Every structure is written in structure tokens, then in C-alpha cells.
Amino acid sequence: MTTGGKPLGIALVSGGMDSLVMAEFCTRESNLALLHVNYGQRTESRELSCFHAVAEHLKVPTRRRLVVDIGYLAQIGGSALTDDRIDVPKADLARRGIPVTYVPFRNAHLVAIAVSWAEVIGAKNIYIGAVAADSSGYPDCRPEFFEAMNEAIRRGTKEGSGIVVKAPFVHLMKKDIVLMGKSMGVPFERSWSCYREGEKACGTCDSCALRLRAFAEAGVPDPLPYETRPDYARKSSS
């Protein structure tokens, strides 16, 4: 389906910085419908509020906004983001291995929902703001994951649907996403990256650390209030 000369696309918008910039960027290519998924995460209410703020910023009509609840991911557990019994760890950007904030196979669930909706509304492109190069190392954010998902979509959807999942930022550094967002005038204050729920971002979880480092490296002030703002600058090898 095309609207206004552009194909219809679905952007997965979590309410975070990456998906905010990605959604703005993808309006150049597609007329967007926006999808948000509640999965029992600690910051569910804050993320949902940011999703609606992004939708208003992009002037996406309510008929092209979808909010879906899949609380079963919290029932499954296994992640500090969905299980209050597992503490959100202090930031360690040099950590190797998969952190406890990884929600097992989450992106497969999100993409599957987006594909189902795409078949119904005639969308061709599905956009997700996954970042592999400068991130926490989640396995379902890797390029090969999305390649495999596209093969599954090709085999598992109606012939001629032409649905493709795109992760346009997967190879970018986060500072480049900040610079791109600044150049497009995105409202960073309407995004939330912290793994904890609070009036202010904690500044001490991995997600806050990655965001603070990205803004610092980009030389752009982060408009979010933080409980604390440690220096997460990369150490020089010299």
C-alpha cells in the first residue's frame, strides 16, 4: 500500500533514543505506522508515554498507532528488565558476555507482531532501531538475526507481501545517531533510555551509560535529567 506516493511502513518505537531518531529518519522513505509493545518491563509506563510523544511529534494519526501487550515475557522472566528479583546491574561498558538485562529473544516477538500487522495494513517495510556496533551485545540485535528473520518472513507470509525488516542503524555508533537526531531536530527530551523507573534517569545502568557516552562523544547536551552523570568516555589506547 502507498500513501502520498510513499509505501506504508511500520516503525517499532520503544520510546528510546534510537527508535526516536530512526522513526524520524524513516519518514523520508515511508509513511509510518507506529508500533509499541508493552512486555512487562520496569519502565513500561514511561516508555509508553514517550511512544505517544513521538507519535505526536511525527503527526502520525491515531489509526496508524498500535500498542500491544505481551506480558508473557515478564511471566517467562530471566531478565532484570522484567523480573524485580533480578537487580539492574551497575554500568560496565567493558563487560563481555550477555548482560542480565537481555530479554530472551524479545526482538523476535516484536518483529513477529509487526509482520502480522504489516500483512493486515499492507505495509512493506518494518523498521527497528537495533544497534549492534555500540551496544550491550544482545544477540537479537545482530545483523544476522535480522537476515534470518527476513528469510522466515519470506517463507511465512502471503506470496507477494514483500515485507522486509530493516535495521537502518545496526552498524552505526551511538554518537552518530545523536548527531543525526540533532541534524533533524528530534526532541531527545521525549525519549527515555534508563532501565529504571524514576523521575530522573539513574545514570548508572548500561543504557544510561551508553546514552551519556554517545551524547558526550557527539558534543551534544543530553536534555534528560539524571540522578548522576558519570564520565563514560572511552579510554584512549595511547
Give residue ranges: language-model regions.
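Alpha-helix termini
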Residues: 28-29, 51-53, 198, 216, ...
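ATP-dependent adenylation/nucleotidyltransferase module used to activate substrates
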Residues: 2-184
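Charge-dense, low-complexity polyampholytic segments
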Residues: 126, 195-201, 220-228
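Short alpha-helix boundary/capping motifs
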Residues: 54, 146, 205-210, 236
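Local cysteine-cluster metal-coordination motifs and their immediate loop/turn environment
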Residues: 112, 192-213
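Short Fe-S-cluster ligation motifs
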Residues: 209-211, 215-238
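Short, intrinsically disordered, charge-biased short linear motifs at domain edges
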Residues: 180-183, 188-197
